[in-house]
Structures are given as structure tokens and as C-alpha cells.
Amino acid sequence: SKSNAVAVMLPGAFYTLKETQVPPIAALRSAGVDMAVATDCNPGSSPISSILTAMNMACSQFFMTPEEALKGTTICAAKALGLQGNYGIIEPGALAELAVWNATHPAELSYWVGSSILHKRISHRELS
């Protein structure tokens, strides 16, 4: 897209509030709009704190691909927060906020619901 705008998907709020109008994922995808995925964790409209659950819901409710959900919780989420370049990427000079998962394929992150497949966290370290 020509804009720097990021569409933020909040599947937890969609589910909790019993919304019926699904975000226009196909149109956003066709237009090249970056799509972030977030929990919007709060006690009123989205009591979901697991980013993996949000990824699963983005795939199952909004028909995002597992790759889009992963990109939506990393690169696009950082961009939505104005943190692109330092976060959401794995490359030299970036600030590490990494989760190491017990998974054999990245798509598994969107698959498992209610189980913790986190192996280890690496936080606030510059990657070299």
C-alpha cells in the first residue's frame, strides 16, 4: 500500500463482543495493507492474554494465513506501534524480544490453543 497505515486485527474483541462483520481481510490483502494482530487484552471486551490464541483466532475467524498471523504479531505489530526497524525482526542491530517455541514449523504457532509451547524468552538484548 502507498500508506504507512497498519490495519490492526483484534480477534479476541471480535469473539467476546459477538461481532458478526469480519474484517475485509481479502481486500486488505489485495491492497497490500499491512495487518497486525493483537490481543487487546482488557477485562471488558477482550479477556485474552495469549498472543498464540489471538493468532489462532485471526486464522480461524478472519481467514488470515498462519504466515500473515505471524507477520501480524511481529513485523506489522512493531510497525503499528511505531517501533519498526528495532523490533519485530531478527537481524543484526535489532533489539531482541524473542520467544523460542517448541514447534517444528512456524504455522504451529497458529494451531495450538490452550497449550504452552514456549521454550524460552530472550528479552532486551541487541542482536549481533
Q: Can you annotate each of these PLM segments?
A:
Residues T73-I75, K79, L95-S128:
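C-terminal cap of metal-dependent C-N hydrolases
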Residues S1-N86, W101, L127:
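Active-site-adjacent C-terminal substructures of enzyme catalytic domains
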Residues F14-Y15, Y87, Y111, H119:
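Sequence-level detector for tyrosine residue identity
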